[in-house]
């Protein structure tokens, strides 16, 4: 959790137990959530839905916390939620190829800014230590 906060997260939620999850979600957005992008699913999804605003959109992307979840019908129905699944498998290969080509064009044209740090392999230990507390960036390691 400390690393997420150090890297710019607006809020972090302790997943130790149900009370901590609910308290963390409530503290992070006292007015509730209009959009939830869920990479975890599992037992955490019901907590997120409980803190969703009426009419919220719930985008289900991953299942790091488990492939199944138990959501009560009233919690889902009374919130008028829109549940959308999103995954690479649902995106046609041509769309992915086109998006990647556009990304590369932006990179070639200098429209992408990447925060890179170059380091030598011999210096990798010191670089890793510095990255633990410094700003996030992509690391390029050379011999």
Kindly label every feature range from the protein language model:
Residues 4, 36, 48, 83, ...:
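Terminal peptide-recognition signature
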């Amino acid at each position: 959790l400390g690393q997420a906060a150090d890297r710019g997260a607006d809020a972090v939620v302790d997943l130790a137990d149900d009370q901590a999850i609910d308290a963390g979600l409530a503290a992070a957005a006292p007015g509730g959530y209009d959009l939830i992008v869920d990479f975890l699913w599992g037992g955490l999804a019901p907590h997120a839905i409980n803190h969703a605003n009426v009419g919220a959109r719930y985008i289900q992307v991953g299942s790091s916390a488990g492939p199944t979840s138990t959501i009560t019908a009233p919690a889902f129905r009374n919130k008028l939620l829109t549940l959308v699944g999103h995954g690479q498998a649902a995106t046609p290969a041509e769309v992915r190829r086109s998006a990647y080509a556009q990304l590369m064009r932006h990179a070639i044209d200098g429209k992408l800014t990447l925060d890179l740090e170059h380091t030598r392999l011999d210096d990798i230990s010191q670089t890793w230590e510095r990255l633990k507390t410094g700003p996030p960036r992509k690391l390029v390691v050379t011999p």
